[in-house]
Each structure stands twice: as C-alpha cells, then as structure tokens.
Amino acid sequence: KQYFYKEKILNIPTRDWMYVFTCLILGTGVVVNSIFKNLWGRARPNDTIQFNGDEPFTIPWLNVDYCDTNCSFVSGDVSFFTLSLAVLIIFNKQSWNTYAYIGIGLISLLRIMEGDHFFSDTIMSFIITYVIIKVLYNMFQHFPEDLNLNSLKPINFSKVKWRSRKDSNPD
C-alpha cells in the first residue's frame, strides 16, 4: 500500500511537506492548543474583573484554575499564523518574511482588541511556535529530500523483549 505521495507537490520535496505538517500538529495542535490552552487556566481579558468579568487577572506563567477549556494563555490564532513562517521557509521566500511578521502582528493586535487575549498571550504564542518551527526545521534537514515513508517497516511488538522494573533493578 502507498500511504504517502512519492512525487514532489508544487515542486517541494516530501520531507518539507512533512516538516510543515509536523509543525502544524506538534506546534499549534499539541503544544499550544492541547497543553497550554487547556492546562493553563488563565481567564480571557473579557472574563476578568478589570473588564467587567468575574475572574481575577493573573500573570502569564502562573498556572491557575480560572478557566476550564480554550483559555487565554497562549493564543492559538497567533500560533497558527506563525506557521506561515514554516511555509515560507520551504518555499525559500525570505523576502516575504516581513509580510508574515506584519500579519502575525496584526492578528495579535486583533485578538487583543477583541478582548480574547492579553499581549503576553500573543507574544508567548509566537515565541513557543517559532522555537518549535526552528527546532523541527533543524531536525528535518537530516532527512533525505525524497523521504519515502512507505519503505519504513512497522515494529513487530510481539518480538520485543519486555523487561519489568524488577529485571532492571539490581537490588
């Protein structure tokens, strides 16, 4: 069975498309939206006492319980828009980076003006996503351009020798 397309799409190698897909899933999906937004209970500005809400204002890195899901810290919209930098990297369009940064700034400003995020939420979202993009880029450069995932063989877990904690502890 063929699970991945072997040819270049838009003249971009498979490795680079896998890089962008991984940035989307890991950066915006897992780290920003699943971990920070759902585990960091910072209330949105509209929900704080200072803006006629019921919850108190909290500093960005303080993990509190004023919001259950889809909380303020960090901004998923800014994270998703920061992924445009990853796409620009694979298209080798450094001249467009200025436009990407302007777009990220405008999205951040819009989210702040709507009362959905604090300034720190948008800045930290950009920093977290940018670091993930750069780390993944450096990792993916070690893979061949014509990355063919169809040639990978699945692990046969029935042949794996499992060790218990008792086996690994010499006491």
Question: Residue locations for each model-derived region?
Answer:
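Membrane-interfacial segments
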Residues: 3-8, 35, 39-44, 95, ...
